[in-house]
Amino acid sequence: MVPKLFTSQICLLLLLGLMGVEGSLHARPPQFTKAQWFAIQHINVNPPRCTIAMRVINNYQRRCKNQNTFLRTTFAYTANVCRNERIRCPRNRTLHNCHRSRYRVPLLHCDLINPGAQNISTCRYADRPGRRFYVVACESRDPRDSPRYPVVPVHLDTTI
């Protein structure tokens, strides 16, 4: 049986709609600049256990984020990494605005262990501490960002 064109178009629209919803779930809350949202998601000098640390992110996103990495360093240190040599981003090879840290930093990687959680208050995470290099994508600052840093980290691409 061959699907009719109309049915195929409806299915395609539904699929694209679902992909759009999934994409919007990962979107930055509009009240934050890219750098501010990066700091909320990835900078925490002394993060508590993952289940507690992830509550802030999950409250903004209204969902249980599958995984996240907290760099146990300062925003200033991470912004200075943006001065390092520019490289192609390892995870997103189409981007050429990444920079690798020169030193390993302590970090805390969080993995969601109950992906079927119906409520963000019940999200539970496994903690994986470590010490690694990291790669960030950087961009010129938004006018709402501090003028102290002309180029700011906006995306944690990977840890090495």
UniProtKB/Swiss-Prot annotation:
Interacts with bacterial lipopolysaccharide (LPS) and lipoteichoic acid (LTA). In vitro interacts with phospholipid bilayers. Substrate binds at K65, N66, Q67, N68, T69. The active site is at H42 (proton acceptor), H155 (proton donor). GO terms for molecular function: endonuclease activity; nucleic acid binding; RNA nuclease activity. It is an enzyme of class 3 (hydrolase). Gene3D superfamilies: Ribonuclease A-like domain. Cytotoxin and helminthotoxin with low-efficiency ribonuclease activity. Possesses a wide variety of biological activities. Exhibits antibacterial activity. Belongs to the pancreatic ribonuclease family. GO terms for cellular component: extracellular space. Keywords: Disulfide bond, Endonuclease, Glycoprotein, Hydrolase, Nitration, Nuclease, Secreted, Signal. It is found in: Secreted. Its EC number is 3.1.27.-. One of its GO terms (biological process) is chemotaxis. Residues 28-72 are annotated as: Required for nearly all of the bactericidal activities. The modification 3'-nitrotyrosine is found at Y60. It holds the Pfam family RnaseA. Disulfide bonds join C50-C110, C64-C123, C82-C138, C89-C98. Glycans are attached at N92, N119. It comes from the Eukaryota. This is Eosinophil cationic protein. Its main location: secreted. Residues 1-27 form the signal peptide.
